[in-house]
Amino acid sequence: MTIQQYIDNLNRLYQTGNAREHSYRGDLQTLLSTLLPDILVTNEPARIECGAPDYALTKGKHNIPVGYIEAKDIGVKLDSKILKEQFDRYRLGLSNLIITDYLTFEFYRDGEKVKSITIGSITGSQIISNPEQFSEFESLIRNFVQTISQTIKNPQRLAEMLAGKARLMAV
C-alpha cells in the first residue's frame, strides 16, 4: 500500500460519517507493514506496564519491541488536555513512541517530541493528502524502527529513567 492509497482509504471511510478511531486501524497496519517489511505490526497488542498502546512494532524471531503507536480518531487534537494523562503515561513508559490521529504523526524518543509530520488534512468533508511530506514520513518511519534503546551511561540518566517508572507505578 502506498501512502496515497492509505490516504484515499481513510478518506473513503471518513466521508461515510460513521467511521471512528478503530475503523482506520487496518489501513495504518497495512501501510506500516508495507513500508516496514521486516517489522511485525500488531494491532491491539497485550497490555503492558504503562497501558495498552494501539500498536506494537516488533522485529526478529523473538519479536523484540522496537516501538509503539497510540492512535486517536481523525480530527482529535493530539494536544488535548483530556488525553494528557494517557499520553504522559506512554511518554514516560515507552522509549520509542508515535502518537497519531492517522494524519499527523508525532514521534517521541525517551519522552521528548523529536518530530511531527502531517501527511493529510481535513478540508471540508474530505481528507486531502500532503504528498510533499510522503518521502520524509517514510524516512521517519524507517528510522523509528531502527532506534535501539539507549545504554545507561551515567547515574543521572538512570535516576531519570527510574523516576519515570516510579511515577507509572504510583498511578
Which positions does each model-derived feature cover?
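Short, basic/polar, glycine-containing "phosphate-handling" surface segments that engage DNA
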Residues: 1-11, 60-65, 72-88, 92-96, ...
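Charged, often low-complexity linker/regulatory segments
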Residues: 1-47, 165
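Generic alpha-helix structural propensity
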Residues: 19, 23, 27, 50-52, ...
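Generic hydrophobic/packing signal
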Residues: 25, 31, 41, 53, ...
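Conserved catalytic cores of phosphodiester-cleaving nucleases, focusing on short active-site segments
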Residues: 28, 55-57, 67-73
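Short amphipathic alpha-helical patches
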Residues: 29-37, 51, 55, 92, ...
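Active-site metal-binding core of divalent-cation-utilizing nuclease and nuclease-like domains
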Residues: 38-63
